[in-house]
């Protein structure tokens, strides 16, 4: 049964924190299905927070949205070198595998998705020229403010942190979409995009924003969070249970509660995808026995009323997370080279430091051997200068005068 434009809009926007351009999105839906992109910069190892945007991708696909997943490798490098160039390509591959495996585990047909690697178009002439045009029409203050909640903040920021937001705006044009989807932490970049694209002669896009799900320790969940504040996609049940049991979970308090937030934005939507209708907490009989909830609202009310304790909430969450991860890890068995990809993408810090040190030494050795200039000349198509040519050039300068 096909959905009406209003039904599609409701499905597209449910569980979102904010929508920019709602009127425009509705107008497009009255004529055709919308196109949208979600971008992810391959920096730290993917964690359970990635289930949150995946649930929305499921909603988008169900609503007939044409979805593009951008693996933003150039952005990963620009973000204060979170992903060195030596590692970024390996991380792109690892992220792609993880995203596809999460979606498959949720029975979301990935055939309807388009995967694009940022460097496949961001290094081309037309994109580069537009990037210069954007830079010439955007103030440093605007770019810095736009990336404040997304780009890593350091005492002495690199110039790359100012390039990052503008490229994210340009991606909307070069991916040919109507809408960009991301976390509410991206809001300032989205607003910048709405301002700068029309200046370049391109149309303004709509923007959909997910709430930021708190980590297990409270605060924003991210790949750079402390290891015990996030659950890795590859964590085993014992590790998952240990992390959840140590989570910050104040009795009766809903705000900044990472356990409740995960249930709301991941567990219950996942149950819907699997056709399940009950969230079950299997307490031992001596502690009250089994608890059954039909909706997230029932769970939240019980927690507020203190009829559901933090310990029992965590017990139910452990089961939910382990079920989700078991499905993903089963899909990952299709990739026999996963271990080697993971090691290449996230090598031991000691090994990485050793490799970088060796690379630096190799450059020094090459310079001493006089090969550096020859390599540069060869790459540019010019022949290396001979000693006699160099002497002749100095003569022409008339240095004695």
UniProtKB/Swiss-Prot annotation:
Protein biosynthesis listed as a keyword: yes
GO biological process, alphabetically ordered: cytoplasmic translation; tyrosyl-tRNA aminoacylation
Coiled coil: none
One MF term in the entry's GO annotations: ATP binding
Biased composition (Low complexity): 368-388
Motif placement: 'KMSKS' region: 220-224
Compartment list: Cytoplasm
Positions annotated to bind L-tyrosine: 37, 164, 168, 171, 186
Cellular component terms per the entry's GO annotation: cytoplasm; cytosol
Keywords of the record: Aminoacyl-tRNA synthetase, ATP-binding, Cytoplasm, Ligase, Nucleotide-binding, Protein biosynthesis
Pfam families documented for this protein: tRNA-synt_1b
UniProt cross-references to InterPro entries, sorted A to Z: aa-tRNA-synth_Ic, Rossmann-like_a/b/a_fold, Tyr-tRNA-ligase, Tyr-tRNA-ligase_arc/euk-type, Tyr-tRNA_synthase
Biased composition (Basic residues): 355-367
Primary location group: cytoplasm
Listed EC numbers: 6.1.1.1
UniProt-annotated stretches for the region Disordered: 352-401
Domain of life: Eukaryota
UniProt motif 'HIGH' region: location: 42-50
Function noted in UniProt: Catalyzes the attachment of tyrosine to tRNA(Tyr) in a two-step reaction: tyrosine is first activated by ATP to form Tyr-AMP and then transferred to the acceptor end of tRNA(Tyr).
Family label: Belongs to the class-I aminoacyl-tRNA synthetase family.
Matching PANTHER family: TYROSINE--TRNA LIGASE, CYTOPLASMIC, TYROSINE-TRNA LIGASE
Annotated protein name in UniProt: Tyrosine--tRNA ligase, cytoplasmic
Name of the coding gene: tys1
């Amino acid at each position: 049964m096909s959905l009406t434009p209003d039904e599609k809009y409701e499905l597209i926007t449910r569980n979102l924190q904010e929508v920019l351009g709602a009127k425009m999105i509705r107008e497009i839906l009255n004529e055709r299905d919308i196109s949208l992109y979600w971008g992810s910069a391959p920096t730290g190892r993917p964690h359970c927070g990635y289930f949150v945007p995946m649930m929305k991708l499921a909603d988008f696909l169900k609503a007939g949205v044409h979805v593009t997943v951008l693996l933003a490798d150039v952005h990963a490098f620009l973000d204060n070198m979170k992903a060195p160039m030596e590692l970024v390509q390996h991380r792109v591959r690892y992220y792609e595998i993880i995203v596809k495996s999460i979606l498959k585990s949720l029975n979301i047909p990935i055939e309807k998705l388009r995967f694009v690697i940022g460097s496949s178009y961001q290094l081309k002439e037309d994109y580069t020229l537009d990037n210069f045009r954007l830079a010439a029409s955007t103030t440093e203050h605007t770019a810095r403010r736009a990336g404040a909640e997304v780009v890593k903040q350091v005492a002495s920021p690199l110039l790359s942190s100012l390039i990052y937001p503008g490229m994210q705006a340009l991606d909307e044009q070069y991916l040919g979409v109507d809408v960009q989807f991301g976390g509410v932490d991206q809001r300032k970049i989205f607003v910048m995009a709405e301002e700068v694209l029309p200046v370049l002669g391109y149309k303004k896009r709509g923007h959909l924003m997910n709430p930021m799900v708190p980590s297990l320790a409270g605060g924003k969940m991210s790949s750079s969070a402390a290891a015990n504040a996030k659950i890795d996609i590859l964590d085993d049940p014992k590790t998952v249970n240990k992390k959840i049991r140590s989570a910050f979970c104040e009795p009766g308090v809903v705000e900044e509660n990472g356990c409740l937030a995960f249930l709301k934005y991941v567990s219950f939507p996942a149950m819907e995808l699997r056709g399940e209708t009950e969230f079950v907490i299997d307490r031992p009989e001596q502690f009250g026995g089994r608890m059954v909830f039909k909706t997230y609202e029932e769970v939240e009310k019980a927690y507020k009323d203190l009829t559901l304790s933090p310990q029992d909430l965590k017990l139910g969450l452990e089961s939910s997370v382990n079920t989700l991860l078991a499905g993903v890890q089963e899909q990952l068995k299709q990739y026999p080279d996963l271990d080697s990809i993971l090691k290449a993408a996230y090598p031991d810090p000691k090994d990485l430091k050793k490799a970088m040190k060796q690379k630096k030494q190799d450059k020094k050795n090459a310079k001493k051997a006089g090969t550096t200039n020859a390599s540069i000349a060869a790459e540019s198509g010019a022949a290396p200068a001979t000693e006699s040519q160099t002497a002749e050039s100095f003569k022409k300068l008339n240095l004695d005068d």
